[in-house]
């Protein structure tokens, strides 16, 4: 695999539309878009939702969108093991936006990057710095993640994915046991 100094992942209206198109081919009953914007949700919007089930649904939908974009770009299982990250926001209006709120909302995308193997893990030993920038372009909404000074480690990625698979199997097994116990009552 060719190593790159920079890896760029862009979330825009085009790839959001294609994701939703694919999603609704298999989920025909859905009426409301499961992801409303290529932009991350503001922390203010995330924290207002107190229902954990709704919060988790938002997180899972954004993770699915993130995985779609990464696969579309051919970057799955890239295994970035060391990098700096810049998140660039393009806002469609001149309404005031707090970057810290939007940067905090990027957690859902970064979790998706880990799950699909673009990055080995999202901890501080793999992502050393996170910075943000923004601009206004009338009518355009997008978010661009740029990983720079990248180092890659496919062996570490495989180890982390194997551990995560075991952890997921144990979690699923535990959930199945809890359902069985609750049905017996």
List where the protein language model places each region.
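Catalytic phosphate/metal-binding cores of nucleic-acid and nucleotide-processing enzymes, i.e., regions
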Residues: 1-185
